[in-house]
Amino acid sequence: VSLLNSLSVIAAAFTGFIILNSVLIIAGSLVGASGLILTVIMCKAMNRNLYDVLFKSFGGDGLEERLTRTKVGSEPEEISMILDGAQKVIIVPGYGMAVSQCQHQVKEFADLLSEKYGTEIKYAIHPVAGRMPGHMNVLLAEANVPYEQLIEMDEINPEMAEADLALVIGANDTCNPAGRGDEGPLAGMPIIDVDLAQTIVVVKRSLAVGYAGVDNDLFYMDKTLMLFGDGKQMITDLNSAIKDS
């Protein structure tokens, strides 16, 4: 997407040369260059080169994967009881948080835990979470999340095993253990090691696969609890359950 965006404004820059419009030339060159840089950054974050992204399959074999496994959903009240006494909680935001626009509810959730239980809160940020690098940072900054709580993937991974609970909000491929394997569309892709946390809570509409078309084993682990539904509604209900507990 970022490459196509950059090519579109580069075309605008060439149009500027044709009609002798310096504004189009300058603006097109600047935005086009930034788009190309963004493309390179995202390729590195996915451990892929540009050729593979453009000409090789990344979303499976094109056939919809049939999910034969099931997982019983949990209730916000159950999650709130687990959170009572949690010393460290790591929040892992993904594209689903952006879609549901629940960053303010997530900030309220973090504040409730800090004030009520004295819980240490951190946010694990994957380089390609969302639609572009920095997408999650922008959304959380909008909700006034302290910058020092936003931790990049490489820095937060060593801490995941220390977390009493990891809350995954709308993330899928970026925390799929299949990234550690040697085969499949996600092979070799850096991931957030959510599966190392003591307890895992995933807020997601369903068990559907992510962009790569790969089922996520994280969802079916015994220590994983699923909150099925809209992100904003689920976090709002969870906040209410914490207040009432």
Task: Outline where the language-model segments fall.
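Transmembrane helix-loop junctions at the membrane interface of multipass transporters and ion channels
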Residues: 2-27
